[in-house]
Amino acid sequence: LQFQIDDNTFWGIMHGDNSGYYEAFQILAGLYVYFGEKDRGAYWAHQADELKARANEVCWNGTFYTHFVKRTPITISGVDESKQLSLSNPMDVNRGLTDLKKAVSIIEEYRRRRETTAAFAEWFSIDPPFPDGIFGDKKLVQGAYVNGGIMPLVGGELARAAFENGFERYGVDILRRYWNLIGENQATYLWYFPNGAPASVETSTSPEAQSTDGWGSSAMLYALV
C-alpha cells in the first residue's frame, strides 16, 4: 500500500474527493453569509459552482462518475476500469454534485447491477474490484473491504439519494434489507464479503473489525430519518 507521495505515486482525480470539497465550500459560504460576511460567502459559493462544473466535465462518464481519472498513464490488467462503480457515487448525489438527470442515472445503475451481481446486495465499495494483491496487501482480495466489499455505508447513502430523487420504494427496500441483515445476527459491520460473511479481524485491513459499526449504520439512520 502507498501511504506516501514519491516518484512512484500515480496521480489522478477521484470524484468523491471533489464532491466533498464542493459540499464543504457550500457550507463555508453559508457560514460566512450567516455571520454577515456576504462578500466572502459569495466568493466561496462561486468556488463551489466552478468546482462542480469542472468535476462534472472531467469525471462524469455519461452514466456515473469515473472512479479514478488518471493523470499518470498506467494500465491495470485484470479489470475494466471504465466499468468501475465506486462508493462515492451516491454521496455525490447527496452532496449536490449532480443534477436530477445524473442522480437518476446513478441510482438506475445500482438497480441494474443489483439484477446481475452475485453479491447479496449492490452496496459495493467498488464494482468490479481490482485483482487480488494489486495493492500489495494479501488481505485486499476481491470482495474485501474497499476492493469490492459490500458496505452499509453505500447502502445508506444510496437509500437517501433514492428518497430525494423519486425512488422512494427503492429507498424503503434498501432499509428493509438492512434491517433484516442486522436482525439476523444482532450486529452490523463496516463491510461484508459479497457472500454475506461479515468482516473479521482476520480478514480486515482496518485496525479493528467490530460488530458495532457506526459508519454504515449512521448512513442508514440518516436515510431513515
Feature map (PLM): residue ranges:
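A general structural signal for well-ordered alpha-helical packing
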Residues: 107, 155-156, 175, 221
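Terminal, non-catalytic domain-edge segments
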Residues: 217-225
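C-terminal substrate/ligand-recognition segments
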Residues: 141-168, 222-223
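Short, well-ordered coil↔helix boundary/capping segments
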Residues: 12-15, 145, 149-152, 214-215
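Aromatic- and acidic-residue-enriched carbohydrate-binding clefts of CAZyme catalytic domains
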Residues: 1-12
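Short, solvent-exposed loop/turn segments at the edges of secondary structure
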Residues: 1, 16, 85-88, 151-156, ...
